[in-house]
Each structure stands twice: as C-alpha cells, then as structure tokens.
Amino acid sequence: MKVAISGGGTGGHVYPALALIRELKKSHPEAEFLYIGTEKGLEAGIVKREGIPFEAIEITGFKRSLSLENIKTVMRFLSGAKKSKQILRDFKPDVVIGTGGYVCGPVVYAAAKLKIPTLIHEQNSVAGLTNKFLSRYTDKVAICFEEVSDSFASEKIVFTGNPRASEVVGVDSEGALEAYGLVSGKPTVLVFGGSRGARGVNEAVEAVLPEWNNRDFQLLYVTGDVHYEKIKDSLAELNLGNHISVQPFIYDMPKILNAVTLVVSRAGATTLAELTALGVPSILIPSPYVTANHQENNARALEKNNAAIVITEAELKNTDLMATVDSILNDEAKLNSMKLSAKQMGRPDAAAKLVEAVLSIMK
C-alpha cells in the first residue's frame, strides 16, 4: 500500500498527519509513505526528522479579501498542481490524504484529477479555505467538530476526531511532574500558550503569581522559548515557592497532560483533542490572531458542553484568572463534572476511525 499525505504551515496540520501515518503502520507495516509539503513550512523539518520521504512544492495561501496577490497565488496553485501530478505519477499512491493548510490544495486537487482516491481532514470547528475548496473534489471529508458539518456535503462527511488524541491516551505519567521539580499526586495546573508562548496568556499569569504563592495546588507554567528569559528575570524578586515551576518549553507534553488536574491554554484543535481524550478540564484563552477566529469557535464547543471555561484575550484584563482557577479546583463537584464532560467529548479512538475512513475509499 502506498499513501501520499499533504498538510502544513502549522503543527495543527502536521501532527495529525504524522499520527495517522503511525496508526496506518500498525495495521500495514509494509505501507510506503510520501509527504508533500513546502520547504518553508513547519512540516519540512518535522517530517524529515521522522524519516518519512518528503517532496516539496511552492505555494502560498489565498487572502480572504480581494487582493492582487491572489492572482499570483492562482498561478502558483496551477504550477503546484502540475508538479504534484508529476510527483504522484512517479509515486503511484493508492490514496492521497490532505490534513489542511494551503499546501495540500494543489496536491489533493491533482490527485482527484488523476482519479486517485482522496480524503481531507478538517481539525477545526470552522472550515479552512483550502478544505472548503477541496471538498468538491474529494471522496471523503473527515471532521472533528459537528459544528463544521454545514460546510461540507453531508454524504462525504465522516466524524473521526483528531488522530493526535489517540497518542496521549494511556501514556505513563510516572515521574512527569518530578522532572520539573513538582510532586506527583498533588492538584496541578498546567499553563501554556503554544510552542512559542502567548504574550496575552503570559501577562495574565504573571499578574496572579504573587497570589499563587499562597495556594496549595501546583503550577507548571510554560512561557514559550521566546518569552522565557524576560519572564524569568521579572520573577526573580517574587521568591516563588517550590510548588511553582516556570519552564520555557515542554518536550514530553503527553506525559504531562496525563499528570495534571487543570489546563489553561490556547484553543488549538490538537490541544483540545488531547484534553478531551483524557478528560482534562480547561480554561481556554483563544488566540485572536487566527483565520476566521476558529480558536474561539473551537473553545465555545467545549464551553457549550461544560468541558471548559472560555476567556477571550479581550476579557483577560477584566477577569481575575486566579479566581477562575480557584472556582474549579476548590469545587470538587464542578471539577468532576468538567472532567466527565470533557471525557464525553473525547475521541480516543480517533486515529483508528480515520484509518477506517481512509481504507474505505481505497479501490
């Protein structure tokens, strides 16, 4: 079996693709894979480090508003589709999968024109422009949020969830908190704003750290590499207790997620898939700097089901973050209710469901 996969730009498109590849390898160890992305995207480094064959095309994204740049993008799309056809003819895949981001546009389009079975995976509650366009040509559209179903033809939709969810379930958390100077078994809050951190989240947390010194529950505060040194210097005079650990980055996130009680974070699709698969309650601060405000829409889906509390970045200045954390951790009934609600939304079998959908369209 030969499988071509394309998706990129951000980790939210790349990591689900890699999770799918790993799941496919379990049942089809003989399978061959080819990843098609861009050299400038996050995918180039990540995929190559995984040892997966990689081919690059050149493409840029469409602007949502009218722009002369879109004319250039159309030309790049056509050129990318032409190169994709050649790559696919040489590789001869049995199926082509797109996991989002503009790079998968010409790849999946070319595959459809070559009559190769195709599937796209939409991680968010708001459909991306590329996936909206491709859905006219693909055989199946795999989704993670019911809210996005109106964007696609109902006969093509299959609800799978995000395959990254499957990779955090059952991970051994022994020693996870100790690695960061904390104690296992104590209520612990994880705060992070994505791989690079988020200034708005950091400012809100810094404002309540003096209060946190007086709390019994632990804090694992991940600032992001970019912000770490500045924040570390500003906290030097606070004499933070041993129950507060400030880190630039977390490399073993699946282990940590299995060890914490509550998460304060952005609302990226992959993060929410992981939290719900594990049944971890959350306080979500959606990034306002994303396309079509999709993070807030993602977060509201959890809020509607009592799995999270949502605070927009605009609301942060007038919201007592410490009081919000207290309202959850000091109310066992509320904490347990949010855990149960998050767990009910989770799709720990998402990777297997997505593989099932892929195999169903293969000739």
Curated annotation (Swiss-Prot):
> Is DNA-binding among this UniProt entry's keywords?
no
Q: What CDD domains is this protein classified in? A: GT28_MurG
Q: Domain of life of the organism in this record?
A: Bacteria
Q: What is its EC number?
A: 2.4.1.227
Q: Name one GO biological process term.
A: cell wall organization
So where does UDP-N-acetyl-alpha-D-glucosamine get bound?
A: 10-12, 124, 195, 250, 295
Q: Where in the cell is it found?
A: Cell membrane
Arranged from A to Z, the UniProt key words for this protein are: Cell cycle, Cell division, Cell membrane, Cell shape, Cell wall biogenesis/degradation, Glycosyltransferase, Membrane, Peptidoglycan synthesis, Transferase
User: What protein is this chain from?
Assistant: UDP-N-acetylglucosamine--N-acetylmuramyl-(pentapeptide) pyrophosphoryl-undecaprenol N-acetylglucosamine transferase
> Per the UniProt entry, what species is this protein from, by scientific name?
Listeria monocytogenes serovar 1/2a (strain ATCC BAA-679 / EGD-e)
**Gene this protein is translated from:** murG
